[in-house]
Amino acid sequence: MSTLKKCFSTVAFSALLLGGTLSAQEPDFDLSAQRSEIQTVAPVPGCRLDHGGIVINPTPQQMGIDSTQRLDISRGLCLKDPAGCFAEDVDFVKLADKGPRLEILFGAKRAARQGVKPVSGAYRLTVDARGVTITGYDECGAFYGLQTLRQLIASPASAGGRIPHVTVNDYPDLPSRGVVEGFYGTPWSHEVRMSLIDFYGRFKLNTYIYGPKDDPYHSCPNWRKPYPEQEAMQIRELVDACRRNRVDFVWAIHPGQDIRWNEEDYRNLVGKFERMYELGVRSFAIFFDDISGEGTDPERQVALLNRLTEEFVRAKGDVAPLVVCPTDYSRLWANPTPQGSLSIYGRKLDPSVRVFWTGDVVCSDLTPETLEWVDSRICRPAYFWWNYPVTDYARHIMLQGPVYGLDTTLTAQQVCGIASNPMEHGEASKLALYGVADYAWNVEAYNALDNWERGLGELIPEAREAYRTFAIHSADTESGYRRDESWETRTFRLDEWTAPAAAALRAEFERVEQAPAILEARCTNRALLGELRPWLEEFARLGARGLRALDLMEAFRAGADDAAFWPQYEANLMSAAERRSYEAHRSGTMKLQPFYQQAMDDMGYGWMERMLGRKPMTLRGIGSFASAHTLQTRQMFDNDSTTYYTSGISQKPGDWIGVDLGGVHGVGEVLVLQGRNSTKDVDYFDHAVLEYSVDGRQWSPLLDELDKQYVVRWTGSPVEARYVRLRCLDSKRTNHVAIRSFEINPLHADRLSARLSGPDAGDESRLPYAFDERLDTSLPLSGTLELSVRPGTEQYTLLMGGLDAPVRIEQLSADGEVLKRDETGNSFFRFAVAKGTATLRVTGDVEIFEVIAR
């Protein structure tokens, strides 16, 4: 018998079970008027550029190219390194005793004569007939000049070892550019960290902040303890790798949850810093984020930071200024008054200490407005902690889209740096970090789309197009921080079908289905492939079911015979196991999977209307949150109390979550399960009203003034309604909202004129799924289903699946006589009711999707 389809427990066929904007057929419902905020997904800015065969990242500030003149380096370059600093950094070029020179110089005076900007990391690179000359403002600048040369040599324009003459005058816009390993979840392996550090150096990122939330020696209760020998050795290796790549290794500590504001813990903290100093660490950060209790006191935080600055940083002489992540790191909950912690920082914190800031919310864009707000309070340019591409709040997503949402008018006087918080998938985070490096170096010139196109070729040049196919459909978070996805793909509903649109979409689904195999065969970065593989496997399945959905749509539009249509339709339904696998590793969430789901729903709705002779009820999630308009709302209807829809952003009075029934129906029972559980969860409306409406404009209460209720149940005389919702009333709660179940008129097994016998006897909880008028639910039968035949019933249709052996159908009289017996091996079976039949009996090992009486 095949894997069971997912079981549900409401009385509606979910033809439109997915959350989304209302269809054009319902223009009278003003959904936007019911929403608490405008929800948009900003498009990716920029355009793809022709770089003439020269690809340099980050984009240089100034670059002149003379492609008519070439320097032949095929026989090697003669290294001139008077400072003796770069012998290990020129492994990308052949060296020779004679020939064109590669001269590497640095120093403020030399740089000034060459017109190099007097900032750390600035350099001038010249390629002419005499050879290559790099002049850095400092050693770091000269190293960056080498990284530009490395990319120039690797560019298509330099094929055959003949480099075009160029002049590059370059410098970084932001002083601090890098990564904060600050996510929750599985920390990176040592090998991944080492790989990433090389990546940082190659693309001119100069900061790596080591602060894994799940490193026990970084946070409480073990922050006071030294690292064990093996872990300490790895820290030293990371420090050495950073030094080779001219990256500042910043070791962060997270002591706030259990710190005691006394001399003993101050000494514990200094002692830990001393041990890290012995391992080579010369930069330190203290995180006071995500804590409660005494550790949140900003006065004590400032006193600690100032004392450490004086007694440790300045006393050492070779330690960089401290970095702090405040408790109020987001405007969402920061106290804006002069008594707030940020204002206290501004008045009392040593000016050398850099202060992290995540923006208006935890995951948000970098804008002049958010910087003006925070800078005016902390009295210094903020250090932007960008929570992208981190997915610790959405681990089912692999973010591979463009880097955007970073304002291109900002200067170092507004923001002192940017630190990207990546995914726990370090190799797969490189695509986003490629963009962060580009932005932070040359802010005004940053072109998000072009950078992404270049980054794809950098990471997987041997299978760039296949990687692009996956990446463009694996970009949205489905949460509060939405990202554009599938922007080149046009999908459509069943009633919008055109042959050209279907052909274009078919071609895309074919690329989707084929891309994983191409990547598996060609990608040489096996570590990256290993991180992507679970998503790629699901991506191939998504492509296959999208293609089958297109085939089904064509057959449905052509008026396919019912008996021929159903087996194909049933075969393309996702099983419970398939859905769980997809939910764990989602892609195509903005367009591709919704297309599949809507196509199946639209066909199923139209087909069931034909089967029933009337319009069935539908269930579709709606609400005031952006995530209420994605497939996530299906979690409210999946009959699984361990899954839930989540708003993904904070709630406020007036917000709501509800159900669209697709038309006006009698509603006599509503059951809502709030929260991720029904015990002590905080993600729920603690003050709410349950309402219904016919038109979406005028609402009437079913249950008013609900106070701290996880389980919301209403039964009563049926009311006419199309919409039912749970709306937040006045409340100080700012948590997310989670809904595990939103049931309308649920069927109850004990009220059905049907029973199970054989192995299934005694467990009739799934019995309603054979009668709920939904094609995405099913009754797994291993025995006999017996049901009473209503007077006047002339015909039955059985919709089945997973037939490994014939199913027996018997019609019995009131006294138990078998009037007719049939056997079928077909999943679609329609038969007439014999005269005098009182009971129908179905026996076999089969999935019953629906028993339809006419």
Where are these regions (language model features)?
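Acidic, contiguous N-terminal accessory segments
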Residues: 24-129, 135-137, 158-168
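Disordered, acidic Ser/Thr/Pro-rich linker "stalks" and the adjacent N-terminal cap
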Residues: 604, 609-667, 673-688, 696, ...
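Catalytic-core regions of glycoside hydrolase
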Residues: 138, 154, 182-183, 278-282, ...
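Feature activates predominantly on carbohydrate-active enzymes
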Residues: 67, 82, 86-88, 111-272, ...
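Bacterial N-terminal signal peptides
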Residues: 10-19
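C-terminal functional modules
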Residues: 31-35, 56, 448-618
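Short beta-strand-plus-loop segments that form exposed binding edges in beta-rich domains
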Residues: 726-734, 841-847
